[in-house]
C-alpha cells in the first residue's frame, strides 16, 4: 500500500487534500490598520453593526472580554442577501497585526465546512496598507464549493468598514 504523509494511505491523503483548501486576497485600506484589527479582533467589534448594518446586523460577546485573546463572539451577518450566524473564537497577534477567527458554530459555514478559519493581517505596502484575508477550510464533501461567496463578502465588508473609518 502506498503511504502519504503521516502514515495515511496516499489515496485517502489525496482525497483529504482535495477537500481542504485555502483562499487569499488583499484589500487596500486607507484607514489606520490598527483600527481595523480592533474592529474584528474584538476591542471595538460592538461598533461594527452601527457602521455597516447591511453586512453585520449584530455582534454579541459570549465568553471573555471584548478584545481578549480567546474570547468568543457571535455575529449575525448578511451574506448574499441571506442572514447567517457565525460564532468564533478570537486569537490576536498584536506584534504581527494578525487576527485569527476560528468558527465554532455557523448556519451555513459549518454546515458545508468541517473547519473554517479566517485570518486577517494588516501589511504595510509602500505608501499604503493592505488587509490580507485568508480563509482556511475543510469541505464536508467533494460537492461543496470553495467559499468564494465568503471571500467576496469579506472583501466588501473590509472596503465598507475602511470607508466609514476614513470618513469618521
Predicted regions mapped to residue ranges:
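Beta-strand/loop substructures that line and gate deep hydrophobic ligand-binding cavities in soluble
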Residues: 91, 100-156
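Glycine-rich portal/gate segments that line the openings of hydrophobic small-molecule binding cavities
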Residues: 47, 57-109
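Residue-level signal for tight coil/turn positions that link beta-strands
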Residues: 31-33, 94-96, 126
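Short, surface-exposed coil-to-beta transition loops
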Residues: 22-24, 83-88, 112-119
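Hydrophobic ligand-binding cavity/cleft-lining segments
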Residues: 2-68
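C-terminal helix/juxtamembrane-tail motif
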Residues: 2-20, 148-168
Amino acid at each position: 500500500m502506498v503511504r502519504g504523509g503521516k502514515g495515511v494511505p496516499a489515496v485517502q491523503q489525496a482525497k483529504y487534500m482535495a477537500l481542504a483548501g485555502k483562499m487569499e486576497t488583499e484589500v487596500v485600506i486607507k484607514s489606520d490598520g490598527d483600527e481595523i484589527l480592533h474592529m474584528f479582533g474584538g476591542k471595538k467589534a460592538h461598533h461594527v453593526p452601527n457602521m455597516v448594518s447591511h453586512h453585520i446586523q449584530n455582534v454579541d460577546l459570549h465568553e471573555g472580554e471584548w478584545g481578549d485573546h480567546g474570547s468568543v463572539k457571535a455575529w449575525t451577518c448578511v451574506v448574499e442577501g441571506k442572514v447567517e450566524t457565525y460564532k468564533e473564537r478570537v486569537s490576536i497577534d498584536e506584534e504581527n497585526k494578525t487576527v485569527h477567527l476560528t468558527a465554532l458554530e455557523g448556519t451555513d459555514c459549518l454546515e458545508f465546512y468541517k473547519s473554517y478559519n479566517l485570518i486577517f493581517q494588516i501589511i504595510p505596502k509602500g505608501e499604503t496598507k493592505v488587509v490580507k484575508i485568508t480563509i482556511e477550510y475543510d469541505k464536508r464533501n467533494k460537492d461543496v464549493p470553495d467559499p468564494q461567496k465568503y471571500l467576496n463578502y469579506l472583501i466588501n465588508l473590509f472596503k465598507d468598514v475602511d470607508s466609514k473609518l476614513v470618513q469618521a
